[in-house]
Structures are given as C-alpha cells and as structure tokens.
C-alpha cells in the first residue's frame, strides 16, 4: 500500500490524497508533524530524492525564518535534528510506494506516470 506523508492542512497533500482516492489507489496518510519520522527514515528519503537540499522546501516561511546557522546544517546529524524539530520543512507530500520507492511533490502528470497502472 502506498503511504503519503505530509501535513493535514497542506494543499498539495490534500490534492494528492484526492487524486489517489479518485483513481482508486489504496493509500494511508501520515501527518509527519504528529508522527515524527525516525532518523533512519529521513536518511532513506534523503538518499532516494537526491540529497537534503532537494528534500526541503527552501521557499517556506519556516526555512526563511531560521537563524543562519540553522539553515546551513553541516552534517547528516544536524539535518536529522533540524527536520525532526521542523518537519514542515520537508517538501510535501512524500510518497512511498509498496516497493519502498520515495518521491516528493504532487502534480497530476507525475502521479499519472507513477500510478499509471491504476488508471
């Protein structure tokens, strides 16, 4: 079953959930502000999406309001601490399919490509 990670009040997450419902893709939703992800999970996501910088939303208000030393983590440990403290920095939604493949973000075209077998 596909797992969609994000925030309950996020428009992109709502759109992704609606898309999956509309096309009958079985999924569960996890609000990662309420259910923090383990450091190992964060590292797995980072490795699959291509790095910490690609995993976060640098245009978010939260990112812009961080102090300069916080928005320049120098190690995996610092990144993991930052994202567990501010999970809203993670680009949403994070989509993990049955086979463990991780992707981020929502668009109709990317979901059609990813879940085309359901259509």
What is the role of each PLM region?
Residues 33-119:
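Thiol/selenol-based redox catalytic cores and closely related redox-interacting motifs
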Residues 1-23, 27-32:
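Local sequence-structure signature of Cys/Sec-based thiol-disulfide redox active-site neighborhoods
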